[in-house]
Regions:
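ABC-type ATPase nucleotide-binding domains, specifically the catalytic core motifs of the NBD
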Residues: 21-38, 48-52, 65, 148
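Conserved ABC ATPase signature
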Residues: 61-66, 70
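Short catalytic/signature loops enriched in Gly
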Residues: 53-56, 149-254
Length: 259
């Protein structure tokens, strides 16, 4: 049983149906033996559970009559209508202001606890990951390149792409005239290079990286798809040290959140 919450809640709602009708229809799809009255009562309960104020009167409102944060709550209610064991949340805080983002993430955490439900969070926000997740998988070109406990990946990243992501995040405590970036561009999925998919952009790539595709290999408590991160790959090359330092500074700023 899987439920999904997508990036833009407005496009996930039918503009020609009230939110009450949409929820009722979805519940009846998952529970065909339920009466329409019971389904509507359950729809109201889901709106209340996800924090919609004055839920009774708002059942008959249209999607455009809700704020962005409220629409996201309604989409979460729709995702819960089938009583999922896994909730996939794809960038659930996109286009929301910071205070509303925090409320939505707290709602997802609360629902996961109360419903004993797993959550798969898809996001680029390292702060959200540090505050919310237990484990993190870093993906590049359609593959997992690093996976481990959140604190380990944030504080001790092993893959050059993870180092690059961490290093490219501006440090609010340090004044700088330029931003660190990862060289090059993401390859198309129909044109992934031989060897390691990241090697054209990697500052540490060597001949083996260009010819042999690395498997996920154990490195401490994590797994990393990198020859340099393998126990036989030796120390991280000097070319990656500046990314490491920037990544460490950012991880240090997240220490309290990750804890």
């Amino acid at each position: 049983k899987v439920g999904a919450v997508f990036q833009d809640p407005l496009t996930g709602l039918d503009p020609l149906m009230t939110v009450g009708d949409q929820l009722t229809e979805t519940i009846l799809t998952h529970h065909p033996t339920m009466t329409k009255g019971d389904a509507r009562a359950r729809a109201l309960a889901l709106l209340k559970e996800t924090g919609i104020p004055a839920a009774e009167s708002r059942m008959d409102h249209w999607p455009h009559q809700f704020s962005g944060g409220q629409r996201q709550r309604i989409v979460i209610a729709l995702a819960l209508s089938g009583d999922p064991e896994l909730l996939i949340a794809d960038e659930p805080t996109t286009a929301l202001d910071v205070s509303i983002q925090a409320q939505i993430m707290e709602l997802i955490r609360k629902l996961a606890r109360e419903r004993q439900m797993a959550v798969l969070l898809i996001t680029h926000d390292m702060g959200v990951i540090a505050e919310t997740a237990h484990r993190v998988a870093v993906m590049y070109a359609g593959q997992i390149v690093e996976i481990g406990n959140v604190a380990d990946v944030i504080h001790r990243p092993q893959h050059p792409y993870t180092l690059g992501l961490m290093g490219a995040i501006p440090d609010i405590h340090t004044k700088s005239d330029w931003l660190e970036q990862i060289d090059g561009a993401m390859p198309g999925l129909n044109a992934i290079p031989a060897g390691c998919a990241f090697h054209p952009r990697c500052r540490a790539a060597d001949g083996r990286c260009r010819s042999q595709r690395p498997p996920l290999m154990p490195m401490g408590t994590c797994l990393a798809r990198c020859w340099m991160a393998s126990p036989t790959g030796g120390p991280v090359p000097e070319r990656l040290v500046q990314f490491e330092r920037q990544a460490f500074r950012y991880a240090k700023s997240l220490k309290g959140e990750a804890a």
